[in-house]
Amino acid sequence: RFPWGNVWEIKFCNVGTDGNLPVTVGSFEEGNSVYGCYDMTGSVSEWCEDWYHPEYYLSTPKKNPKGPIKGTGKRIIRGGSMFAQNVYKLRCAVRMFGEPSDRNKSVGFRCAKDAE
């Protein structure tokens, strides 16, 4: 459910208790994933390269799906931001979508590459 395990711990992530502002990367080391990824819960949700398609997961591979080649003109946004309304929406697996031109304070991005 969460990068650190299945039990919710408010002290492991930025959920806006310090004035609803993003914080320096790595400020919540207890919340790091087992892979060493920082800040996967709280702070801001993140844009993904994947296009959104409402039926994609009906026929996708179970392991490491790459996302549809084309979609509805919307991109995927993942992860719960500090503005989430409940703990369920703070999970890394939360999947939303938006227009690529959308901008707001609850969505950012993360630079990443394949480990191979």
Question: Could you describe each region identified by the protein language model?
Answer:
Residues 1-96:
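Functional-site microenvironments in short loops/helix caps that host divalent-cation chemistry
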Residues 104-116:
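Short, structured beta-strand segments at or near domain termini in extracellular proteins/domains
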Residues 35, 102-104:
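Short coil/turn motifs at beta-sheet boundaries
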